[in-house]
């Protein structure tokens, strides 16, 4: 019997140890002292080390971790679930940028992550606030952007009981995020947020999601007031319920304000192995017609863009840039080709896929020559080998940081490396120039429908761009044409959605870019279809004094879809729009606006310069509504 009682006592003790979440003997000693302190607190508060008089709240803990991780802004759409985080963050000097749609907040955080090469943060309220972000989170996942999404949630005791905006949010975000977590105790806030940020930035970057029930964020006094204690409890059941509620809230706030480390955890970035680097070096040395395709992953830290440029120049290969890598080599670098990628890939004897993926953008690998040696570099194993064996085969595959790999290859080649034969570079340059000349002729064509030639206007836009401009691409046909004509001036000066092909990124990306670089002009290149998704954010630009320049290619049509649908089905159903005065919409939201049509086409450059001057003044955003006509420039361009 005695043995049984001893065993039972041990089991009960272990259960209490677990339930109280005792993490050390020092904590246990502290609990025992509090139990006998007679400090006027409830016995369970003492057992769990709760400070009943504290006015602090969980939002302060969240904000302190973000501040320690050098987060400078949080993009939000307000909601009662997350108010403590926003108030606490602002008190710590973190800028709170509130938007007109939750999806914009996440797109803005995505842009910050790309441009600052760190974590971007968005916070939204529970339920529909979170479901509104799903497209942007998926876009960030496919674009490999490290961002933290903070979401509110119903009180812990009301989960699954029909509370306002209570849904299973975790199940929605698990497929989209590298890391998801729900915090139910204040002492877990700090380690959870630190771990989430580490996960977002480690390996192949991506979005992470942390859910905070409302009672984890508000002060103890308010939570106790709202939890539902019965002050006149009579009988066993009512008293037992009170005891349970007291246990719950005491455990929730237990040891909440104990000192914790809030600084960043070390991130894990895959690095190339030396033997793989040597294999690539040998292929480069023997190649006569190498081609280098650089994608967005090459812009990720730790390598700085300037060091990557030096490595690319040392390799000496003709280069094609895509995604965030556009602009890496500036406007007119002799190694960069723009128009003849298919021809180059067909004739190449070495193709280096530096963060470039064999998806629809490379015809799933079918555009790669069967005679070419192929090197694939990517942090993501699935992207590294996408469609391999089906349409292409790699000779060297390296799952590692792309820019680090290129820098190490360049260093291993050394200063005595004989660069690519000039005949190969010269032949591609001649073909590229021929294509540019053909495009220039199309720019000079007068359209018979009375509207501007979009190619001619885009050339004017390109000529008007200052060297510090950041370009945001959000659209289909008009933006697709711009990608061939408008040239970003430097690294990290081009933002597009990435592989997901998402429409609607414009307002959010521009907001994020302008927040990071408030003194630089940010241009949104919009189609008239895509501008409808985020045009209301001109209100956000005005309220936060973050002026941007919007360029709308207005042909009153979802033209990228119409190009295939109309000739194939002889129907324009759902593709027609109106020649809407989007500039007047911007004006009504406190911005400057102008329309360019056939009557003032000769003043296009002057109007663009005026838009830039308005933006540079810091007083207003600008929107130029350009009434364009149809061309055959992008016939057959649809991707499936």
From Swiss-Prot:
CDD domains: TPP_BZL_OCoD_HPCL, TPP_PYR_POX_like. Belongs to the TPP enzyme family. The keyword Electron transport does not apply. Binds 1 Mg(2+) ion per subunit. Binds 1 thiamine pyrophosphate per subunit. Mg(2+) binds at residues 528, 554. InterPro entries: DHS-like_NAD/FAD-binding_dom (IPR029035), THDP-binding (IPR029061), Thiamin_PyroP_enz_cen_dom (IPR012000), Thiamin_PyroP_enz_TPP-bd_dom (IPR012001), TPP-bd_CS (IPR000399), TPP_enz (IPR045229), TPP_enzyme_TPP-bd (IPR011766). Endoplasmic reticulum 2-OH acyl-CoA lyase involved in the cleavage (C1 removal) reaction in the fatty acid alpha-oxydation in a thiamine pyrophosphate (TPP)-dependent manner. GO terms for cellular component: acetolactate synthase complex; endoplasmic reticulum membrane. This is 2-hydroxyacyl-CoA lyase 2. Keywords: Endoplasmic reticulum, Fatty acid metabolism, Lipid metabolism, Lyase, Magnesium, Membrane, Metal-binding, Thiamine pyrophosphate, Transmembrane, Transmembrane helix. Coiled coil: none annotated. Its cofactor is Mg(2+); thiamine diphosphate. It comes from the Eukaryota. GO terms for biological process: fatty acid alpha-oxidation; isoleucine biosynthetic process; L-valine biosynthetic process. It is found in: Endoplasmic reticulum membrane. Residues 477-557 are annotated as: Thiamine pyrophosphate binding. Its EC number is 4.1.2.-. It comes from Caenorhabditis elegans. It is a single-pass membrane protein.
């Amino acid at each position: 019997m005695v043995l049984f009682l001893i065993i039972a006592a041990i089991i009960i003790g272990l259960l209490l140890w677990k339930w109280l979440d005792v993490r050390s003997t020092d904590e246990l000693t502290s609990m025992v002292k509090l139990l006998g302190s007679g400090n006027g607190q409830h016995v369970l508060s003492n057992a769990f080390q709760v400070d009943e008089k504290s006015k602090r709240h969980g939002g302060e803990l969240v904000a302190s971790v973000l501040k320690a991780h050098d987060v400078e802004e949080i993009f939000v759409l307000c909601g009662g679930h997350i108010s403590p985080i926003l108030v606490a963050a602002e008190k710590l000097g973190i800028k709170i940028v509130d938007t007109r749609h939750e999806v914009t907040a996440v797109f803005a955080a995505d842009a910050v992550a790309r441009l600052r090469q760190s974590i971007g943060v968005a916070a939204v309220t529970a339920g529909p606030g979170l479901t509104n972000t799903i497209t942007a989170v998926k876009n960030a996942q496919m674009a490999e952007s490290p961002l933290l999404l903070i979401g509110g949630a119903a009180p812990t005791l009301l989960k699954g009981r029909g509370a306002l905006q209570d849904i299973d949010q975790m199940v929605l975000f698990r497929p989209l995020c590298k890391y998801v977590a729900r915090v139910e105790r204040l002492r877990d806030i700090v380690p959870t947020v630190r771990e989430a940020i580490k996960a977002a930035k480690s390996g192949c970057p991506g979005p992470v999601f942390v859910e905070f029930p409302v009672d984890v964020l508000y002060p103890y006094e308010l939570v106790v007031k709202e939890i539902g204690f019965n002050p006149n409890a009579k009988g066993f059941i009512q008293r037992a319920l009170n005891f349970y509620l007291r246990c719950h809230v005491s455990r929730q706030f237990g040891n909440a304000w104990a000192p914790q480390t809030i600084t960043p955890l070390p991130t894990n970035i895959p690095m190339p192995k030396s033997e793989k680097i040597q294999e690539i070096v040998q292929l480069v040395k023997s190649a006569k017609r190498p081609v280098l395709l650089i994608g967005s992953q090459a812009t990720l830290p730790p390598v700085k863009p300037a060091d990557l440029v030096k490595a690319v120049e040392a390799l000496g290969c003709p280069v094609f840039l895509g995604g965030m890598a556009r602009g890496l080599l500036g406007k007119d670098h002799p190694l960069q080709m723009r128009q003849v990628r298919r021809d180059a890939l067909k004739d190449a004897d070495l193709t280096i896929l530096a963060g470039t993926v064999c998806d629809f953008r490379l015809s799933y690998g079918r555009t790669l020559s069967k005679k070419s040696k192929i090197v694939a570099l990517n942090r993501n194993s699935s992207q590294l080998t996408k469609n391999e064996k089906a349409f292409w085969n790699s000779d060297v595959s390296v799952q590692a940081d792309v820019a680090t790999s290129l820098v190490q290859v360049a260093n291993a080649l050394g200063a005595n490396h004989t660069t690519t034969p000039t005949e190969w570079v010269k032949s591609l340059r001649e073909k590229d120039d021929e294509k540019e000349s053909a495009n220039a002729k199309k720019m000079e064509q007068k359209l018979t429908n009375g509207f501007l030639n979009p190619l001619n206007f885009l050339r004017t836009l390109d000529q008007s761009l200052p060297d510090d401009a950041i370009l945001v691409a959000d659209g289909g046909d008009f933006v697709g044409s711009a990608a061939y004509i408008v040239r970003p001036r430097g690294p990290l000066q081009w933002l597009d959605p990435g592989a997901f092909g998402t429409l609607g990124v414009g307002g959010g990306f521009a907001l994020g870019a302008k927040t990071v670089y408030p003194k630089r002009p940010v241009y949104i290149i919009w189609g008239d279809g895509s501008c409808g998704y985020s045009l209301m954010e001109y209100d956000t630009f005005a309220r936060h004094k973050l002026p941007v320049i919007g360029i709308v290619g207005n042909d009153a049509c979802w033209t990228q879809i119409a190009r295939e649908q109309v000739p194939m089905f002889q129907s324009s159903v759902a593709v027609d729009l109106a020649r809407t005065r989007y500039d007047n919409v911007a004006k009504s939201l406190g911005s400057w606006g102008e329309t360019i049509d056939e009557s003032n086409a000769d003043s296009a450059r002057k109007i663009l310069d005026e838009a830039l001057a308005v933006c540079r003044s810091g007083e207003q955003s600008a929107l130029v509504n350009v009434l364009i006509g149809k061309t055959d420039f992008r016939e057959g361009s649809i991707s499936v």
